[in-house]
Amino acid sequence: MSNYKSGFIAIVGRPNAGKSTLLNALLKEKIAIMSDKPNTTRNNISGILTNEDCQYVFVDTPGIHKPQQQLGRVLNKNAYSAMEDCDVIGWIVDGSQAFGTGDSFILKRIETLHKPVVLIMNKIDKLGKEQLLKRLMYWQKQYDFNDIVPISALVKDNLEELLKVFKGYLPEGEPMFPEEMKSDHDINFRMCEIVREKILFKTHEEIPHSVAVILERKEKRGNRMYLQMMVVVDRESQKGILIGKQASMIRSIRLDAQKELKDMLGCSVDLELFVRVEKNWRNHENKIKEFGLDELEQIDED
C-alpha cells in the first residue's frame, strides 16, 4: 500500500469534555459508553477507523483530573500512558467553557511529551459565530497548538476536517488491525460496559464512581445467551440504592441493559445481576486490578 498511513491518536481532556461521544461519532458505532457523569471512561478504549488510505486508531482515555483516590490515580496513569505512546494528541475541550484548573493540569503533562497536539474545540453547536471566533482566539493564546479544529461531536459537525488534520500527523505504514475491526476490546468488556452505562444513567451521584461490573458467567443456551454479572460497590448504603425498593432499581437496570445486549449479540439475552459490597475498593490497587481497571481480565469465549 503505497503512501498508506496508520497510527495512534490519544483523545484526552477533562471529564465530560465529550471524548466518548466523539469516538462513537467518528466510528459511526457505539464503542465507548456515554454519560453526563465525570470519568465515565475508565479504560483506554481503542476505536479503529479504516479507510482506503489511512487507519486511525483512536484511544479514548479517562478524563484527566486531580485524583482523590487510588482509582483516580490509576485512571490518570491510563490516560498518560496513551499520550506517551501515541503519534498525535487530540485535546478535546468544551468550547463554551474557559480555560480552567483542570486544563492546566493536562497542559503541564502535554508540555513534557513533545508530541503534535490538535485542539478539538467541541460543542460549537452551543455557540454563535461571534462567540466561536472569540473562543478560538482565546484558546490560541493558551498554547502553541499544531492545529485547532472546531467541531460538534453531538451533531457530527466538521468531523471529516478533523480526520484530515489527524491524518497529516500519522506516519506512513501498513494497517495494524484488520479492516473490519472497530475496537481492540473484546465482547465481554463491552457487555460489562453496557451494564455500567445503565447504572450511571439511573443512580445518584455517589454511585457512579463506586461501581464496577464483572462478567462471572456466560453460557449459550440454544438461541439465547445467559449472562451473570456482579455489580460491586464500596458501601452497604450504595447496595441499597442499586437494588431499590422491592428490587425496582436493579430490575430497571437489568431490563434496559438486556435490551441493548440483545441488539449487540443478535440473540435473546437472559441477564442476571448481583450486587456485592467491597469496602473502599477504589483505594486498593489489588481490587482495581481484579476488577479490570488497570489490566483487563478476560473470560474465555465459548
Specify the residue positions occupied by each region the protein language model found.
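Conserved, well-folded catalytic cores of nucleic-acid-processing
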Residues: E29, I48-E52, P67, A82, ...
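Active-site glycine-centered loops adjacent to acidic/histidine catalytic or metal-binding residues
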Residues: D60, N122, S152
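P-loop NTP-binding site
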Residues: I187-D302
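Conserved G1/Walker A P-loop phosphate-binding module
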Residues: M1-K77, S81-M83
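Conserved glycine(s) of the Walker
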Residues: G18, N158, M249
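Conserved C-terminal guanine-recognition region of P-loop GTPase G domains, centered on the G4
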Residues: T50-Q55, K77-I148, E219-R224
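Catalytic P-loop NTPase motifs of RecA-like helicase/translocase cores
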Residues: T41, I64-K66, F99, L127-G128, ...
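Canonical P-loop GTPase G-domain recognition
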Residues: P116, D125-S183
